[in-house]
Swiss-Prot record:
Quaternary structure note: Monomer. Interacts with PqqE.
First and last residue of the signal peptide: none
NADP listed as a keyword: no
Family: Belongs to the PqqD family.
Intrachain S-S bonds: none
Lineage: Bacteria, Pseudomonadati, Pseudomonadota, Gammaproteobacteria, Pseudomonadales
Record protein name field: PqqA binding protein
Annotated GO MF terms: quinone binding
Length: 92
């Protein structure tokens, strides 16, 4: 696996839907075969994955929103790498 580049534009793969699930009290990814429960960090990242923002814009927005989190850039890139490897997102 390799980290997504900062100019990549992530988007959810076809067939996946991101939403808050009250019954689970967390954000989830729904897809035809099931559901992925997401932790708070993953939910915050995927809120910004809209097929228009590049990775650099997502990182900048989250760094501004959570300035107290050390290493947030690397954490975001690592999550996007995993999400891509799991086929949750595509990178353009």
């Amino acid at each position: 696996m390799s980290l997504p580049s900062l100019d990549s534009v992530p988007m959810l793969r076809r067939g996946f839907r991101f939403q808050f699930e009250p019954a689970q009290d967390c954000h989830v990814l729904l897809y035809p075969e099931g559901m992925v429960k997401l932790n708070d960090s993953a939910g915050e990242i995927l809120k910004l994955v809209d097929g228009r923002r590049d990775v650099a814009a997502i990182v900048a927005a989250l760094r501004e929103r959570f300035p107290e989190v050390p290493g947030i850039d690397e954490d975001i890139l690592a999550f996007l790498e995993v999400a891509h490897a799991q086929f949750w997102i595509e990178l353009q």
